[in-house]
Amino acid sequence: MSSTQDYIGEEAATRVKILSEALPYIQHFAGRTVVVKYGGAAMKDSNLKDKVIRDIVFMASVGIRPVVVHGGGPEINTWLDKVGIEPQFKDGLRVTDAATMDIVEMVLVGRVNKELVNLINQAGGKAVGLCGKDGQLMTARTMTNKDVGFVGEVSSVDARVVETLVKSGYIPVISSVAADEFGQAHNINADTCAGELAAALGAEKLILLTDTRGILRDYKDPSTLIHKLDIQQARELIGSGIVAGGMIPKVTCCVRSLAQGVRAAHILDGRLPHALLLEVFTDLGIGSMIVASGYDL
């Protein structure tokens, strides 16, 4: 019996210690906006999904203002298969004709978005689902010189609807679909949407959940994770080829958001349980943080 009591006491003491260490971060970030791009394995694994949702609700509960931007590639492929459309990609981009765009919008806006809203609400948060069309939050333009159909870039952002929601205590959950000036829906990369929205909101942080540890000096060796770097160092890593392949657009997205006023951008492994809390509320974090000059935390 005594050993059980000792165990319970030790566990409780550990929890108190963790909360105590997190307190300075909670105090510093209270009232500030954090944009989280949610995707990858953390979206497919139900156990990881539960932990991400709980992390987001925890952040809101301690006064941080989380905004969630999501994609949903695997579920799009599932539904394309159901209707007999074979997914096609070109240079890493989903070829999106009119029929595919209908499925993309149905899945991202009607299914994935509402599932995330429901999960956040069930966990004790207050979520509201949006896409780029709502309140003209984002206006798209067709990618030039790519020949991939209705795949877009962010032309402009009007973040007032999101600002209204976060100031009222809601957690906006935004799918990466937006219309162009003629009303045509476009599929936009969720990282890009998150970065541009973070800039428009003047966010404290942009966090990209990915399927890699972060920025590695040697992509084959997780122990070479770079925990903190500035904009110039990030650009140099791209120029030297250390940042390569699919990591280039993610780092570029982070750098662009920082150049527009976001204070810090993080790339972290969403496959790690409670990755968000570990990154935001611990000294070292678990991913890579790119910062604007003069950033202390």
From Swiss-Prot:
Residues annotated to bind substrate: 72-73, 94, 187
Site (Transition state stabilizer): 37, 250
Pfam families recorded: AA_kinase
Gene Ontology MF term list: acetylglutamate kinase activity; ATP binding
GO cellular component, as recorded: cytoplasm
Protein EC: 2.7.2.8
Major location category of this protein: cytoplasm
Compartments it resides in: Cytoplasm
Reactions mediated catalytically: N-acetyl-L-glutamate + ATP = N-acetyl-L-glutamyl 5-phosphate + ADP
Pathway the protein contributes to: Amino-acid biosynthesis; L-arginine biosynthesis; N(2)-acetyl-L-ornithine from L-glutamate: step 2/4
Function, as annotated: Catalyzes the ATP-dependent phosphorylation of N-acetyl-L-glutamate.
Similarity-based family: Belongs to the acetylglutamate kinase family. ArgB subfamily.
Protein name, entry field: Acetylglutamate kinase
Source species of the chain: Synechocystis sp. (strain ATCC 27184 / PCC 6803 / Kazusa)
Lineage start: Bacteria, Bacillati, Cyanobacteriota, Cyanophyceae, Synechococcales
Encoding gene, per UniProt annotation: argB
